[in-house]
From Swiss-Prot:
Domain of life: Bacteria
One Gene Ontology biological process: proteolysis
PROSITE patterns: PROLINE_PEPTIDASE
One Gene Ontology MF term: metalloaminopeptidase activity
Protein name (record): Uncharacterized peptidase SAOUHSC_01816
UniProt KW keywords: Hydrolase, Manganese, Metal-binding
Organism of derivation: Staphylococcus aureus (strain NCTC 8325 / PS 47)
Protein family: Belongs to the peptidase M24B family.
Keyword Cell division: no
Cofactor binding: number and manner: Binds 2 manganese ions per subunit.
Entry's EC annotation: 3.4.-.-
The protein's required cofactors: Mn(2+)
Top-rank EC class of the record's enzyme: hydrolase
Amino acid sequence: MTKISKIIDELNNQQADAAWITTPLNVYYFTGYRSEPHERLFALLIKKDGKQVLFCPKMEVEEVKASPFTGEIVGYLDTENPFSLYPQTINKLLIESEHLTVARQKQLISGFNVNSFGDVDLTIKQLRNIKSEDEISKIRKAAELADKCIEIGVSYLKEGVTECEVVNHIEQTIKQYGVNEMSFDTMVLFGDHAASPHGTPGDRRLKSNEYVLFDLGVIYEHYCSDMTRTIKFGEPSKEAQEIYNIVLEAETSAIQAIKPGIPLKDIDHIARNIISEKGYGEYFPHRLGHGLGLQEHEYQDVSSTNSNLLEAGMVITIEPGIYVPGVAGVRIEDDILVTNEGYEVLTHYEK
């Protein structure tokens, strides 16, 4: 079943006339055309008969024509009302309720004479949850480049270097490999500074005998990677090394349980139980992982409350962590493809 036919099925299920998609990444997912329109309207209209209409600034029309998109294009000037160029009466319209602003919704009511709205968010999330072979190949390459980032960062470690200096070195050096954008702000944290799960790199200088936490990802052809390694610099304290070994055991055990048909919450429980049994449960304050694709965090989440089942074609992260203030912060994260037989680990830097 194609992406568009899945949307049409949802239109029929909700007795709606069309779907209105405005999240730039979702528009790209359906059209193959990527734009960051800022305050301008950029939207895809999918009608029940399968017709697709892309609304975009007129200055982008030629780029759209050169893209894989084959539907109708409505290009508008900044001084024009886009809706006046494509007058429609749409009784019920499905929207991304998690994204669309109230102001845009009011424009739809007046522009398309919309009487009622439905939600298309979950349908799109479910579509994006299962990756095509092309998407998987791009994520695999993004993961390979993330491995290279860790290698670059580790090779730059030396006593006295600051966290920000390591971040800058990674992000500048990886450009030599064709990377123009990171998935998110690169995180490099030294010692007990890593006890803050989402800490911000600063001017802290590296000392001997502490751990260094790297959390980073790159974007390759619009698709993200996201990995974490915690690396020894010298010989950290006995407790810090004990924490590392517990996190590694939790991650390894969780990954080995991955296969289609297993509830996501069961994977979380495996890692969480190991950490709790070793006395560090209160220091593991977040879910085990999340979906990965066009965004570094996307549907679904690997959490203790998610009863949905793993399916072949999903790409998820597994990232247990223990964060003890004043002692250490350790997280280990890999990108995992769910296969028909079980799983494939896409990130490979040594642990």
